[in-house]
């Protein structure tokens, strides 16, 4: 079963720079099985990025965290890696949009 993760990290080069990095790393993200369900900054603090990501399993989360090449790309895009917090969400949740969780 997939694992949802809520993440928060500080970004210093703006949301557009970070978003462009994500698009450029699409192949690497697919390699880890990562899907972004949401990404956006706080209304009053554009340096605080919040994400909801879906990983296929715990091993893919660990692989993402240990991927030095991807970490460096994130750092170059302004992500302050040391500020990042990733919180796995329990399997006990609901959504009004179940199609986001259907494998295509």
Question: Where are these predicted regions, by residue range?
Answer:
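Short S/T/G/P-rich N-terminal loop/turn motif that feeds into the first structured element of a domain
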Residues: 1-71, 80-104
């Amino acid at each position: 079963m997939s694992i949802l993760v809520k993440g928060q990290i500080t970004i210093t080069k703006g949301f557009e720079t970070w978003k462009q990095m994500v698009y450029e790393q699409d192949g690497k993200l697919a390699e880890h099985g990562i899907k972004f369900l949401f990404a956006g900054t706080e209304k009053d603090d554009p340096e605080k990025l919040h994400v909801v990501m879906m990983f296929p399993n715990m091993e893919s989360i660990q692989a993402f965290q240990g991927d030095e090449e991807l970490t460096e790309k994130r750092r170059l895009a302004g992500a302050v890696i040391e500020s990042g917090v990733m919180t796995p969400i329990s399997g006990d949740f609901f959504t009004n949009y179940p199609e986001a969780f259907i494998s295509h």
